[in-house]
Amino acid sequence: RTARTLKSVGINVNFAPVVDVNSNPANPVIGKLERSYSADPEMVATHARIVSAVHKEHGIVTTFKHFPGHGSAWNDSHVGMADVTTTWADSELIPYRRAIEANELDAIMTAHIFNANFDKDHPGTLSKRVLTGMLREELGFEGVIYSDDMQMKAVADFYGLRSEERR
């Protein structure tokens, strides 16, 4: 029904589905708001691929988010830093892997999460190691990469646009 409604009003891109694995039910922006399909990454992958397929039937591009995974965070990146260095698991990539392997993923949206195991200096959205190394080279994704809102506090308060322009 969502895809049909979006098409009827002229929308052709949906920044959905959320493919974050519900690995932390207390996560203030994923778990507590029930934005995840499941704590089981395979279930998340299956549901997301179904949602994406239905959207495509209606001519709507979907955007899997939030890469590389926001489900294990204890904090909301809208209001501050969300460090997943000790909580993130490789299983959070499964929904992306399954869609990429099946050539069904058009676009992803980045997560402003910080993980020192990926990049000691930058959150996912600003990390070449995450976006080029992990997403493009390791996972083989060739589609569109969207940033989440750059005014979210996890980026704006720590990696403001002016400081990034100087790098």
Predicted regions and their residues:
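Active-site-adjacent structural elements in enzyme catalytic domains
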Residues: R1-G10
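Surface-exposed, active-site-proximal loop segments in enzymatic domains
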Residues: A26-S36, D76-V79
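Active-site-proximal loop motif in hydrolases
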Residues: L6, S36-M43
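Active-site core segment of subtilase-fold serine proteases
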Residues: R1, S23-P25, M43
